[in-house]
From Swiss-Prot:
Phenotypic consequence of gene deletion: RNAi-mediated knockdown in the central nervous system (CNS) during development increases the expression of CaBP1, Calr and ERp60 and regulates expression of other genes involved in a variety of processes including oxidative phosphorylation and redox reactions, lipid and sugar homeostasis, and translation. It increases susceptibility to starvation but has no effect on feeding behavior. It increases triacylglyceride (TAG) levels in normal-fed flies but has no effect on TAG levels 12 or 24 hours after starvation.
Keyword DNA-binding part of the UniProt annotation: yes
Compositionally biased intervals (Low complexity): 322-355
Lineage: Eukaryota, Metazoa, Ecdysozoa, Arthropoda, Hexapoda
Protein name: ETV5-related protein Ets96B
Amino acid sequence: MTISWRALSHFLIPQSDYGEAKTHLEQLQQTLTHLDHPHHHHAHHPHHHLGLYHGALPNTSTITTDSVVSCVSSTLPAVAKAISASSSCDGLQSERKKCPISDLDSGGHGHGQGHGLMEAICAGQKTSPIPPPPPPCCLTLGESSSSPNPIATAALMNASTSGSSSAGGASASLCNDLTRESSWYAHHHHHHHHHHHQLPDELVMYATPTPTPAIGKFGLDTSTEGYLNARYNVNVKGVRHDRTSSFFDIPAVTHPHNHPHPHPHPHPHPYCYRFPSSPPAGILKKSDEEATSAAVYCSDVSSGQHFPHHTKIEHADSTTTAAQQQQQQQEQQQQQQQQQQQQQHQQQLQQAAALHPHHHHSHHGHHGHQQAEQQALTHLTPLHAASAFKFSHTAVISSSAVYATPSHYAHQQQTQSQSVYRDLSPTTLAAVSDADLKYDSGPYNAAISSTYPSALRPNVVDSTTSSDAELRLDQFYASNGISTSSNGQAISQRRGSLQLWQFLVALLDEPTTSASCIAWTGRGMEFKLIEPEEVARRWGLQKNRPAMNYDKLSRSLRYYYEKGIMQKVNGERYVYRFVCDPDALFNMAYGHLTTGSGKGDQHQLTLSLAKTPPTSGDSQTQSPRVAKSEYYDTAALHKY
């Protein structure tokens, strides 16, 4: 609260100062820039506002007002409380001023629609844009302080409305989500106030809540709250403190232009994403409103992006990671889309970086960073996936997509944002950097690729992916004490962390020694336990469980049904089949064994026996790895 209040007051004060300067946006920019330097985070806000006013003045002005108001409101909910508690009438006044100023912007630009709600919120604000509004604003603030959520909601709604004015539907969605999230965001605002202040411009972005729907569209919670909460929890966890440091540490990102960006804001504030008048439906590929929401969300995320990525990075905690992985798996498709977007964004960011090196590149760096982090998390994910499931990469995705989007949004937001959405197509993926590709083909993705329709695989699969996946696998193996490199000693080495399905693959892969007890049926990946008790006995030896029997072993196998690793073949006793690619299967079982040692030949032989020739090596390898990670997930939970 303190920070948010301070940020808010600074924000408001600069705003009030800029109130007069408002007419001179350039001056505002300069002033903001100056302020920016003095008060970094506060500057951000002014800076952002500046960006807002400057870049988005006409359209954004509405957004600005709304976003500012909403930002204020959102911040206010808590901040207002704090303010009222702090008897920061001054702050309120500044806020009022700010409101009027915002109003002036919006009023000046005649963006009343956004202000419809705003008016409701700042009843007097709009009417008497400059001084008169203060009381109403004050009232509003007071009201907000008394009922921060309502106001925050209203403000958010306003923001979304103004922001969404371009997309009325979006605004509605945004409003709802924003409303829902306003309190959340209020928190967020407090925590990330600085950067959220930069968000102010993007308060509309704050609409991010709406994006949740976008996320929901991706299979995440459609409710922004779920997503936001997850993100909030995840992000805030690591980000709150981190955010301050990171956020500020990333001044380039936060105030890309703070840093003597030669052009104050030739590009509207980096985070000043005015949602393109036409919602970048492409990104969310949902409805336009959702697209707008998504855009908002992305934009928001861009600002939020910092913390999200921090969170993820910082907190590549199991929750985040696991959630990321699993949700990523779930949303891999969407994720991929987003990743594509993200990648595109990254590309665009890169391009933008060229355009706006600082911001961009902070952002971009961040972005890349985040992606890298995410990838890293992804690596971690398998184990954490379960716990993190909630937060899931959805957050990641959205964050990543968001991240990417934001920067890119910010930079190319106006022009490129749409293009980005359009470009989100898989092709973009290809264009995207390896890191992105890896991210796309992250373990979850790979796992998904193995488990899910091959259609996904193409996107997921990439040479880079393979290596990425391999890394993950290696990590997995290392974590499980499995030796990926020593193929020959695979089984003995994997003891303890070896999973039953891996053990079965190993047996099937050694027909000379195991043909008597287990063998491929020759129908795809079907295999039969010819001597189930012998298999169970060997498994018991492997796991040092002398009491192991087929009854217990079959229970373990049933666990794999749920995991999508294998299925029971109906109508036949002791006949099971692996659901994933053979290649993926072996890769998962042996790591990179396929490329290494005689086992590779054997494995090929086994594959031929299985009569399921591997599809694309890359895809399969990747899939297996991922699948493996997926499995480990399970394995980590249940080591049979």
